Amino acid sequence: MTTEKSLVAEAENSQHQQQKEEGEGVTNSGQQETQLEELSQEAAEGDNHCEQKLKTSNGDTPTHEDLTKNKERTSENRGLSRLFSSFLKRPKSQVSEEEGKDVESAKEKCEGGQKEIEFGTSLDEEIILKAPIAAPEPELKTDPSLDLHSLSSAETQPAQEEHREDPDFETKEGGGLEECSKIEVKEESPESKAERELKASQKSIRRHRNMHCKVSLLDDTVYECVVEKHAKGQDLLKRVCEHLNLLEEDYFGLAIWDNGASKTWLDSAKEIKKQVRGVPWNFTFNVKFYPPDPAQLTEDITRYYLCLQLRQDIVSGRLPCSFATLALLGSYTIQSELGDYDPELHGAEYVSDFKLAPNQTKELEEKVMELHKSYRSMTPAQADLEFLENAKKLSMYGVDLHKAKDLEGVDIILGVCSSGLLVYKDKLRINRFPWPKVLKISYKRSSFFIKIRPGEQEQYESTIGFKLPSYRAAKKLWKVCVEHHTFFRLTSTDTLPKSKFLALGSKFRYSGRTQAQTRQASALIDRPAPHFERTASKRASRSLDGAAAVDSDRSPRPTSAPAIAQSQDAEGTVPGAPVKKTVVSKAQKETVKDEEKKEEGPPDQAEPEPTEVWKDLDKSQEEIKKHHASISELKKNFMESVPEPRPSEWDKRLSTHSPFRTLNINGQLPTGEGPPLVKTQTVTISDTANSVKSEIPTKDVPIVHTETKTITYEAAQTDDSNGDLDPGVLLTAQTITSETTSSTTTTQITKTVKGGISETRIEKRIVITGDADIDHDQVLVQAIKEAKEQHPDMSVTKVVVHQETEISEE
C-alpha cells in the first residue's frame, strides 16, 4: 500500500520539482538498478546456498535437473532486473525500504522450515502485484565459500549468526553428521561381509578343488586317490605307477569305459575334467601298447602286469586261442602263481580256482594239470616269460578292435596293432596295411581314410575309406592309429610348430615317449629287482634280474614250451622217433636233415633230446612218451585256423632220393629201413656256384632204372648262411593244391618274422606226369611268367627243375 500511495504522491507533485529531480533521478537510477540486481542475485544465491547445505548434509549429489535449473535461475535473475527498472524513478527512501525488505527476505530464505514457506507465500503476493515471477527451483550444489565472495562482510555475518542461533539448522547439521557416521559404519560392514563371503567362497573352492578317483588295477584291486580338479591325465597315471612300483610306465594307460563295451584312452596331456563325464571318476589301468618282444622288457614286474592283461584278454574273449594254446598258457599261469606241483599242498581240483578260459571245461583243467606237473624248478619270472613268448605269437595279440563298415556297407572290424592296420571280416583277417605302406590317415565326420603308398607297378596313391558308427568313433580310431604309429615307428615324438595364423586340422599328437625312448630309459634302470606279491596266490617273486642271463648248460624253456611253434612233420611221426625231416628255410632252400645233422646243429634249432632233459627226473619211459605226445599235439594245434600242409608225391621222393642229402653226408648213403635203392644220376647247375657236380653212382639193384636231374636257378644272397641258421618265427602257413589229369600244382604260402621284419614267401610246385616228351624249358618259362603275373609285387628267388626219367634195360 505504501508503494501505491507513493506513486500517487509523485503524480501530484509539480512538474518543476520533477525536472529538478530528473538529473538526480538519472544519476541515482543507475545506482539503484545495480543495487537491485545485486539484491536479486544475493537472494537467489542465498536460496541456492541453503539448498546446497541441505543437500550436502543429506549426502546427495548434483543431478542433471540441478544443472538445468541453474540456467533457468540466471534467466530469472535477468527478468527481476528488468522488473525493478520501473522503480528507478522512485525516491531514495522508498527504494531503501524495499531494499531492506529484499535483504530480509533473502535472509529468511536461508532459514529452514515453516518460516521459509510463509515468506514464500508473502513474497508471491507481492510479486503478483508487481509482475508474474516464476518460483525459484533448487540448483546444482556449489561450494558456499566460493559463493560468499559477492557479499559484503556486513551482509554475511548476520546470516552466519542467525544460522548458528537457529536450532533447526543445528539439528539438521547434526542429523547430517549422524547420517555420515552411519554411512561410514555401513561402509565398513559391507567390507567385512565381502571378506567373509570371500573366505567362504575360498573354503568352498578348496572343498571342491580335489576330486576322488577310483582306478581298477589288473590284479582286480581298486586304487583310490584324490587329485586336483585341474590335474592332467599324466599326473594320475604317474601316481598309479608309483603305487604299483612300475618304472616302464609308457606301455600302460588309463581307460574310460563307455557303457561297459567301448573304451577311450585318457589323454595324458589334457585335463581329466575335460575328458570325463560326470562326477565319479572311474578308470581302469590297462596295457596300451603291447610290446612285440616282451623279452626286451627290463623288469619282471612289467612282464607280470603284461601277463595279467593277457589273461584278462583271454578270459574276455578278446584274444581267441585254441584248446592246446589255452592249456599251455594256463599251465604257465598256474606255475607262475603256485610254483611247482606238490601233491601234499595241491588238491585234485586246484586248477578250478583259476579262471583260465571264457568257457573253462573239465577237460581243459585236466590238460593244464598234466602240463603243470611236468614243470620242475621254474621260477615265476620264467613262467611269465614263457607265457609271453607263446602269447605274442597269437594272431590277435595286442590288436585294438573297432567296429566299422566298408564302402559297400558290409560289417567289418578294424584292428590297430604295433605292425599296422588290420581288417577282419567274419573273424578272419582279409587285409593288412603295415605302417610303412601307410602314407596318411585321416577322418571326416564318421568316415575314416587311409592313403596307401603306391607299389612297384602303380603310379598313384590309393585311398581306402571306411564308415564308422559315429564321429566320435572315427576320431577315436584316428587317435589310436596316431599313437600306435608314433610309439612303434618313430624315434621321438613330433611337436607342432607354433603358427601365428589359424591352423586347420587337429592338433592332437602323442605326447608320451616312444618305444625307442622307453628302451633307452629302461636300460638306465639300476635299482635291484623289485619284490612284489602275486595277488592270486600271495606268492613272492623270485626275480631273474630281467631274465636275460640264463645258464648255457640249461635251457630256460621247459620241454613243453617250444622255442618256435612249428607244424607237425609231413610224415606224421612223433618227434621223439628217428625221422627224416624236411625243413623249408627262410631262403626257400629245400634241405633234408636226418638225426646225424640234427645232433651236429646248434641247440637252439635242434629239438631238446628227451634223455638229456629228463635224466634227473626219475620218470618211466611211458611217461616220457606220453609227455612228448602232448608236445606234438601242442605243436600240431598251435597255429589255429591254419590248414596242415599236405605232402605231395614229389616231397616223398625228395625225402628219400634228394641229391642235397647225399652231398651233405659226403657221398655215403646211410643204411636203414626203407625201399630198395635205385640207380640215380644227378646233374646240378647253379648260377651262384657256377660249378657242375660230379656223378654219384650208387649200388646197382635189379628193380627199376631211373635218371634224376635237378637244375637249380638261385638269386645271389649275401646273408644266405645266416638265413639258414635263423629261420625266424613262423606266423602263418597255407597250402593250396590243384590237380589235373597230367599235372599237380601245390602252392605253399608262409609268413615268417625275423628281427621285426615280416616276410611272405610263396613256393609253387608243379609235378607233370606223362609218357610223352615234355619241353622243360617251355614249362619253366611258363611257370615263371605265371608266378610274376599272379604276384607282381614279389620277386623270384629260386627255381628248381627236378626231372626223373626211367632208363630202359641194356
UniProtKB/Swiss-Prot annotation:
<dbReference type="Pfam" id="PF08736">
    <property type="entry name" value="FA"/>
</dbReference>
<feature type="modified residue" description="Phosphoserine">
    <location>
        <position position="105"/>
    </location>
</feature>
<dbReference type="InterPro" id="IPR018980">
    <property type="entry name" value="FERM_PH-like_C"/>
</dbReference>
<feature type="modified residue" description="Phosphoserine">
    <location>
        <position position="543"/>
    </location>
</feature>
<keyword id="KW-0009">Actin-binding</keyword>
<dbReference type="InterPro" id="IPR021187">
    <property type="entry name" value="EPB4.1_FERM_F1"/>
</dbReference>
<feature type="modified residue" description="Phosphoserine">
    <location>
        <position position="658"/>
    </location>
</feature>
<dbReference type="InterPro" id="IPR019747">
    <property type="entry name" value="FERM_CS"/>
</dbReference>
<keyword id="KW-0131">Cell cycle</keyword>
<dbReference type="InterPro" id="IPR029071">
    <property type="entry name" value="Ubiquitin-like_domsf"/>
</dbReference>
<dbReference type="InterPro" id="IPR008379">
    <property type="entry name" value="Band_4.1_C"/>
</dbReference>
<keyword id="KW-0539">Nucleus</keyword>
<dbReference type="InterPro" id="IPR000798">
    <property type="entry name" value="Ez/rad/moesin-like"/>
</dbReference>
<keyword id="KW-0597">Phosphoprotein</keyword>
<keyword id="KW-0206">Cytoskeleton</keyword>
<feature type="modified residue" description="Phosphoserine">
    <location>
        <position position="189"/>
    </location>
</feature>
<feature type="modified residue" description="Phosphothreonine">
    <location>
        <position position="805"/>
    </location>
</feature>
<dbReference type="InterPro" id="IPR018979">
    <property type="entry name" value="FERM_N"/>
</dbReference>
<feature type="region of interest" description="Disordered">
    <location>
        <begin position="518"/>
        <end position="613"/>
    </location>
</feature>
<dbReference type="InterPro" id="IPR035963">
    <property type="entry name" value="FERM_2"/>
</dbReference>
<dbReference type="InterPro" id="IPR014352">
    <property type="entry name" value="FERM/acyl-CoA-bd_prot_sf"/>
</dbReference>
<dbReference type="GO" id="GO:0003779">
    <property type="term" value="F:actin binding"/>
</dbReference>
<keyword id="KW-0498">Mitosis</keyword>
<feature type="modified residue" description="Phosphoserine">
    <location>
        <position position="192"/>
    </location>
</feature>
<feature type="modified residue" description="Phosphoserine">
    <location>
        <position position="85"/>
    </location>
</feature>
<keyword id="KW-0132">Cell division</keyword>
<feature type="modified residue" description="Phosphoserine">
    <location>
        <position position="620"/>
    </location>
</feature>
<feature type="modified residue" description="Phosphoserine">
    <location>
        <position position="630"/>
    </location>
</feature>
<dbReference type="GO" id="GO:0005938">
    <property type="term" value="C:cell cortex"/>
</dbReference>
<feature type="compositionally biased region" description="Basic and acidic residues">
    <location>
        <begin position="587"/>
        <end position="601"/>
    </location>
</feature>
<keyword id="KW-0813">Transport</keyword>
<dbReference type="GO" id="GO:0005634">
    <property type="term" value="C:nucleus"/>
</dbReference>
<feature type="modified residue" description="Phosphotyrosine">
    <location>
        <position position="223"/>
    </location>
</feature>
<dbReference type="GO" id="GO:0051301">
    <property type="term" value="P:cell division"/>
</dbReference>
<protein>
    <recommendedName>
        <fullName>Protein 4.1</fullName>
    </recommendedName>
</protein>
<dbReference type="GO" id="GO:0016323">
    <property type="term" value="C:basolateral plasma membrane"/>
</dbReference>
<dbReference type="InterPro" id="IPR011993">
    <property type="entry name" value="PH-like_dom_sf"/>
</dbReference>
<feature type="modified residue" description="Phosphoserine">
    <location>
        <position position="150"/>
    </location>
</feature>
<feature type="region of interest" description="C-terminal (CTD)">
    <location>
        <begin position="660"/>
        <end position="810"/>
    </location>
</feature>
<feature type="modified residue" description="Phosphoserine">
    <location>
        <position position="541"/>
    </location>
</feature>
<feature type="region of interest" description="Spectrin--actin-binding">
    <location>
        <begin position="615"/>
        <end position="659"/>
    </location>
</feature>
<dbReference type="GO" id="GO:0005856">
    <property type="term" value="C:cytoskeleton"/>
</dbReference>
